[in-house]
């Protein structure tokens, strides 16, 4: 039967198919320390684990909850764990600079910043990176981490064209485009065993009996991500004086 099943895999030409005993592309074989025990426990089920090394992980929250801060911490720990590894950082907010990266003691010579404006641009460039990575001999592949900061700031080709033409109509296709992007990327990431960390914005759900937050961009990321961590904050006071914010994490 084993030979028959192997023949079936060969005949179908499915590049993602394999015997379960040989390991599936979705199997988690390694974890990346996030630099935070709470984050490690939420994402990996143990304070000693962390970010699954071949999954999509989303970090969502309102402004100033530390999304980029935590992501840069993950980049640092990934590079520290993998001295021959690299990070591709897709950036849509123009917020990350060389000074910020080097102040966090991140090896800037092993990190690439790729500014992206639209969902389509991110999808195309991410696929190019993954195809190039998969084309290498498995023995020659060095550890790679992909980051998108942030999905919420990505526009679409249609939105840009409408803005340039002076149209004020809302782009109703964005959610479908986001969903299509992750339909293409999810299997590729699993096959390549490359993790993708995405930050996203949240908004308050209107009309809900109990106040709750929802991610922007439709349901595409919600279904594609293996883990979603929501960040929130509250003010820390000393008497009546506000002395800072406390960030809260929950899945």
Which sequence ranges carry the predicted segments?
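The Walker A/P-loop phosphate-binding site
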Residues: 2-110, 122-131
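Amphipathic alpha-helical transducer elements in NTP-driven molecular machines
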Residues: 32-36, 40, 53, 68-69, ...
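Residue-level signature of catalytic and energy-coupling elements of molecular machines
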Residues: 39, 101, 149, 200, ...
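A short alpha->loop->secondary-structure connector
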Residues: 80, 104-111, 162-171, 213-218
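Conserved nucleotide-binding/hydrolysis micro-motifs of P-loop NTPases
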Residues: 93-97, 117-121, 151-154, 202-206, ...
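Phosphate-binding/switch loop-helix module in NTP-utilizing enzymes
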Residues: 118-191
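Phosphate-binding/switch region of NTP-binding enzymes
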Residues: 171-249
């Amino acid at each position: 039967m084993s030979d028959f099943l192997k023949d079936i895999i060969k005949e179908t030409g499915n590049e993602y198919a394999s015997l379960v005993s040989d390991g599936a592309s979705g199997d988690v074989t390694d974890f990346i320390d996030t630099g935070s025990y709470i984050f490690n426990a939420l994402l990996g089920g143990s304070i000693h684990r962390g970010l699954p090394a071949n999954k999509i992980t989303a970090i969502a929250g309102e402004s100033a909850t530390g999304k980029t801060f935590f992501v840069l911490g993950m980049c640092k720990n990934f590079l520290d764990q993998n001295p021959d590894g690299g990070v591709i950082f897709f950036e849509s907010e123009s917020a990350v600079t060389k000074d910020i990266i080097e102040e966090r003691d991140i090896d800037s010579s092993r990190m690439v910043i790729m500014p992206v404006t639209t969902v389509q641009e991110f999808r195309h460039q991410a696929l190019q990176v993954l195809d190039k990575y998969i084309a290498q001999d498995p023995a020659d592949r060095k550890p790679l981490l992909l980051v998108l900061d942030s999905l919420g700031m990505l526009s679409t080709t249609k939105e840009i064209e409408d803005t340039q033409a002076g149209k004020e109509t809302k782009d109703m296709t964005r959610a479908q485009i986001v969903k299509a992007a992750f339909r293409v990327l999810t299997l590729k990431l699993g096959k390549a065993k490359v993790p993708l960390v995405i930050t996203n914005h949240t908004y308050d759900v209107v009309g809900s009996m109990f106040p709750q937050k929802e991610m922007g961009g439709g349901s595409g990321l919600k279904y594609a991500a293996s883990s979603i961590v929501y960040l929130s904050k509250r003010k820390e006071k000393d008497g009546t004086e506000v002395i800072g914010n406390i960030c809260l994490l929950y899945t």
